[in-house]
Regions:
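Thiamine diphosphate
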Residues: 1-68, 82-88, 91-184
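Proline-rich intrinsically disordered, low-complexity coils
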Residues: 11, 77, 115-118
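Glycine-rich, acidic/polar active-site loops that bind/position phosphate-bearing ligands
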Residues: 71
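General beta-strand structural signal in soluble alpha/beta enzymes
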Residues: 13, 41-43, 74-78, 106-107, ...
Length: 184
């Protein structure tokens, strides 16, 4: 709309993440080629989120497809504050800075408690990774765990058990998207 009619709009298109890129990839490429701006929201993403239709309908590949489009910025947030930071940045880049990019963001349908935003994590959220939690027992081993999207909560539960029962130390890194880490 901004190119043809000089009307600024930031559209939001929500689709089933498992099928979205498979079924409309040509249109997504056309959107990239025509310098479209907006948000694609891939709903019920991930391999561990609640899937009402079984394993065959779980999305484990849409971010790989998104990585092939140069002006598509993709994210896989786990918490509401991450989504808020990403949306604010996206609106700023597309509307205020007039960048010809669009965003692909996957979301989940699990109901869980969301933590407060950690101090000074916004830059890490946008770059693709930030330190989320440390487990320090002064053990001999310290493991670096990287978690993205739906699997993060399960990874935190495993880290709690290993830390408490076995004295293993961890740094838990919250990866909001591997694609942006690769680009960097």
């Amino acid at each position: 709309s901004y190119t043809n009619h000089d009307i600024e709009m930031i559209p939001i298109y929500t689709f089933y993440s498992m099928f979205g890129f498979q079924r409309v990839m040509d249109l997504i490429w056309a959107a990239g080629d025509s310098q479209s701006r907006g948000f694609l929201i891939g709903a019920t993403a991930g391999r561990t989120t609640l899937a009402g239709e079984g394993l065959q309908h779980q999305d484990g590949h849409s971010h790989l497809l998104a990585s092939t489009i140069p002006n598509c910025i993709s994210y896989d947030p786990t918490f509401a504050y991450e989504l808020a930071v990403i949306l604010r940045e996206g609106l700023g880049r597309m509307h205020e800075k007039q960048e010809n990019i669009f965003y692909y963001i996957t979301v989940m349908n699990e109901n869980y408690k969301h933590p407060a935003i950690p101090k000074d994590c916004e830059k890490g959220i946008l770059k693709g990774m930030y330190l989320f939690k440390e487990f320090n027992n002064k053990g001999k081993i310290k493991i670096q765990l990287l978690g993205c999207g739906a699997i993060l909560r399960e990874m935190l539960a495993a880290a709690e058990i290993l830390s408490k029962d076995y004295g293993v130390d961890f740094d838990v890194w919250r990866v909001t998207i591997y694609n942006e880490l690769r680009r960097d």
